[in-house]
Regions:
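Conserved recognition-core residues within compact binding domains
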Residues: 1-46, 53-93
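Short intrinsically disordered terminal tails
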Residues: 95-97
Length: 97
């Protein structure tokens, strides 16, 4: 466990793109989420611990977060970003409501 409370594990896949901060190691919550998704995390994605306990890396306690447009963005830029976001994630996370 690191000083911030995150658990690091030996990366089962040494070439995993998310195992770059400590060569050969990966944050366990990142590994778990990448296994749930079936792919590495992409640029701008992060993993949030729902209960805020950083060593509770059960899949059901993790959420995939993505950085969003900054406040004050022009509407046309926000619409362009929203179209990109839906194209990027729409098939993985279909709208259910």
């Amino acid at each position: 466990m690191d000083p911030k409370g995150y658990v690091f594990i030996r990366c089962p896949d040494p070439g995993h793109p998310n195992a770059k901060s400590k060569p050969g190691w990966i944050a366990e919550h990142v590994w778990v989420m990448s296994q749930v998704l079936g792919r590495p995390l992409r640029r701008g994605e992060s993993v949030h611990h729902i209960n805020n306990i950083k060593h509770d890396n059960r899949a059901e306690n993790l959420e995939l977060w993505h950085t969003h447009q900054p406040k004050g963005a022009r509407v046309e830029d926000t619409v362009r970003w929203a179209r990109w976001f839906l194209a990027e994630y729409g098939a993985e996370f279909p709208v259910t409501s």
